[in-house]
Amino acid sequence: MLDGTQDLEVARSWAAQLLKDKNPAKYYISAENFVAAFKNESTFSFVVTGEPFYGHLYGSGAYLDPRCNDIAIAAEEDFVPAGFAKRGGGFQFWEIQTEHTGAAIELLRDAHEINELIDRDAPDSSVRPGDPEEIFWGGLRNSQGQLADAAVVVKWQSGFHVLASVVTRAEDRGQGFATQLVRGISSHASLLGIDLIGLGVRPANVAAQRAYEKAGFSLIGSFTNYSRE
């Protein structure tokens, strides 16, 4: 039997109950964007506002709200909903339980320096200095004193925190900077009272996945994107 709700707290409870420790949904639904959620014994889905409606489906056969033009599906079986086509390469969602380990980072405050690194090595980054969601930027320097990598922790409307705009200087890649940076950011976030940090990663970016896993992140969801034809 399919159940539906327009109550945000009920939806959050359903997601926690059904998805357990692999629950990316909690990052995406908020009082500002939540529309509806649906569940049965083994699947969960939700709808939020977004051009005009965007949905997540968890589990094979999860309910697809007909209002959605764009969706992301996390299911063991690969299937294409009727009237939809695959879009892009999908994404993975990772999560870490923060812990104060003493791992060091530099707290970055020079927007020009951060933007220079992003423009040079990751111009498509989603977050820039001054973004209203930013909590703090962290970075590491190489032996020449150059900014080797940087990343930002942001707070989404849901109240949960996400690591974004992770960028490593091209010449400094493959030297462990990303893993060190993420460990340091996790440690500093713990001091700020941030318990969990989420992270989106492209499936093809295997090097990044390995770095995040070494730093303590766990994969909690793999999604395929679809858009209405």
PLM-predicted stretches and their roles:
Residues T43-A103:
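Acyl-donor-binding surface of acyltransferase catalytic domains
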Residues L2-Q6, R12-D70, D149-A164:
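Conserved donor-binding loop and adjoining core beta-sheet/short helix segment
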Residues M1-P24, Q92, I96-S125:
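Short amphipathic alpha-helix that is part of the acyltransferase structural core
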Residues A85-I96, G198, S218-E229:
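Conserved catalytic-core motifs of GNAT/GCN5-like acyltransferases
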Residues S126-F136, R141-S143, A148-R169:
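A conserved beta-strand-loop-helix scaffold within acyl/acetyltransferase catalytic domains
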Residues I73-D78, L199-Q209, N225-E229:
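Conserved beta-strand-loop-alpha-helix junction that forms the acyl-donor binding cleft
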Residues S60-N69, T168, G174-L191, Q209-K214:
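Conserved acetyl-CoA-binding loop-helix of GNAT-fold acetyltransferases
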